Structures are given as C-alpha cells and as structure tokens.
C-alpha cells in the first residue's frame, strides 16, 4: 500500500481486505506457552493491528496470475471464503497460505494440520480434496516449515490429526 505494489486477493475476500467486515472466528485448541509466544511475536511486529487496503485487484479460481511462474489459482474456501492455493507446476510447489499449517501457532504442534482462526473449519477440511489432486512435492504454508512429502501426504496427515466432527 505504501509502495504502490498491487495486492491481489480472491474476489470473495476483497471486501474483507478493504475492511468491509470479517466474521468472528474460533481459535480452537490453545496451549498457553505457544499462545504467548505467538502474541508476543505478533505484537512486536504490529500483527495485532489491522491495516486495510483502499484498492485490491481480484482474481477467481482457475485463473493464472500474471506474475512469474504463472501460478494457477485453486479455490480452498474455509479459512476465509476466498482462501486459495497457488499451484506453480514449474517449481513442483503449491503455496497454501492458511489452507493448512505445518506449525500451529496456538499449540506449537508441528506437521500438516488445520490452521487456527478459520471461518468455516468443515469447509476448510473439504477443500483439501482440491489440494490432494494437485500432486506437487512442495507444500508452502503461511505458518510453519515447507513440507516436501507431497500434497497427498500433507492432506493425509491433516485428516489423521483432525478429530472427526
């Protein structure tokens, strides 16, 4: 925003990015020490303050973004209505953002698992089927270390650690 760099978001999250509303989300399980670390880290970097955007560029699922690597936008609704993964076949990678995490910021648990602060946890789990079909080796989450055992194994692990609901 301050440097004139365009921000791209899925059309379903454009209003949220502009500050037009966000539903409250459940935190899920919490462990005190990881929670305090997360809050301390976030507070020290301005992460507890929201800065809204005046202008965003939007995309939809199935598009290829006009950036290096031409990533394919894959719908992953659940964390938010406009959550997406960006598949870059040339790199054998998929950027999943908060569709899943490999280090849960509120519990400290590691390995692929659902992300906290998710609007619709069941939709997020259902969206994993799209990720499973991508067949990329590298899964790059918004939180936690890169996962290099493939999308199918990441999804299997998430389902294994997620209680049936």
Question: How would you describe each model-predicted region?
Answer:
Residues 11-13, 79-80, 98-99, 143-144:
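Active-site metal-binding loops of divalent metal-dependent hydrolases
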Residues 102-112, 159-160:
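Active-site gating loops and adjacent loop-to-helix segments of metal-dependent hydrolytic enzymes
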Residues 67-69, 86-90:
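Active-site beta-strand termini and strand-to-loop segments that position acidic
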Residues 1-14:
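Active-site metal-binding motif and surrounding structural segment of the metallo-beta-lactamase
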Residues 81-85:
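Short hydrophobic/aromatic beta-strand or adjacent loop that forms the aromatic wall/cage
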Residues 71-77, 94-98:
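Active-site-proximal beta-strand elements of phosphoester/diester hydrolases
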Residues 1-3, 87, 93, 123-165:
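Divalent-metal (often Zn2+) His-rich catalytic cores of metallo-beta-lactamase-fold enzymes
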Residues 14-74, 118-119, 123-136:
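Metallo-beta-lactamase
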């Amino acid at each position: 925003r301050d440097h004139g760099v365009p921000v791209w978001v899925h059309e379903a999250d454009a209003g949220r990015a502009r500050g037009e509303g966000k539903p409250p989300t459940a935190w899920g399980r919490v462990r005190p020490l990881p929670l305090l670390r997360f809050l301390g880290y976030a507070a020290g970097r301005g992460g507890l303050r929201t800065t809204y955007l005046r202008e965003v560029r939007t995309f939809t699922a199935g598009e290829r973004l006009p950036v290096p690597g031409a990533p394919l936008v894959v719908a992953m609704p659940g964390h938010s209505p406009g959550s997406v993964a960006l598949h870059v076949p040339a790199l054998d990678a998929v950027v999943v953002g908060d569709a899943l995490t490999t280090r849960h910021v509120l519990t400290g648990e590691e390995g692929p698992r659902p992300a906290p602060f998710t609007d619709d946890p069941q939709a997020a789990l259902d969206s994993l089927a799209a990720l499973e079909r991508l067949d990329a080796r590298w899964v790059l989450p918004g939180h936690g270390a890169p996962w290099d055992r493939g999308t199918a194994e990441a999804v299997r692990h998430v389902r294994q650690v997620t209680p049936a609901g």
